[in-house]
């Protein structure tokens, strides 16, 4: 099972990736982890990437694709792999196609942006313990206070509505076009393109997992 998982930030990709990887016995590959591992291992590509990152530059798509090819050739990818957050742009998808990286499925987890904003901006946490709450779905007993200590809860910078909206804007501009890219390719060249599947990402975690497994079995 060679899979690309698509979806906006906050759509629940991380949760579903864990279940999919467990079911199929495949590793989850994110470009961030891959870059860090290559830099740590001191591979030629890792050394090259480190130079770019140390100078504050962005790692080129060519370098990322070469790292991807190196990573998926490792033994733990024999049964397949799941790409999370890659490709992020059309040029990366084109480069992956040109490099002959074969993918079986592209699975999109589709959640309306309003639902994502509500889901993320409603999160609150107790910094000392890491306990998390949600103002609507899992509220504390007393508004704004931790159930155990009674200390004030905070809203992380990442969860503030304007931060979430900004991330969704970047996703709309850069990554959302991949939905059309893969669905069009699947329609035009079904024999060589990955199978494209979209599922709704609203509902319980169990419902979404069930939809994901069903989509990947046909």
UniProtKB/Swiss-Prot annotation:
Q: Which domain of life is it from?
A: Bacteria
The question of whether Nucleotide-binding is a record keyword is answered with yes
Which keywords does the record carry? ATP-binding, Cytoplasm, Kinase, Nucleotide biosynthesis, Nucleotide-binding, Transferase
**Region LID: what ranges?**
122-159
Q: What class of enzyme is it?
A: transferase
- The EC code for this enzyme is 2.7.4.3
Named from the GO MF annotations, one term is: adenylate kinase activity
Name the residues that bind AMP: 31, 36, 57-59, 85-88, 92, 156, 167
Residues noted as binding ATP in the record, renumbered to the chain: 10-15, 123, 132-133, 203
Its UniProt entry gives the catalysed reaction(s) as:
AMP + ATP = 2 ADP
State what this protein does.
Catalyzes the reversible transfer of the terminal phosphate group between ATP and AMP. Plays an important role in cellular energy homeostasis and in adenine nucleotide metabolism.
Subunit structure comment from the entry: Monomer.
* Family in the record: Belongs to the adenylate kinase family.
Name this polypeptide is given? Adenylate kinase
Species this protein is from: Polaromonas naphthalenivorans (strain CJ2)
Q: What is the lineage of its organism?
A: Bacteria, Pseudomonadati, Pseudomonadota, Betaproteobacteria, Burkholderiales
| Gene, per the UniProt record | adk
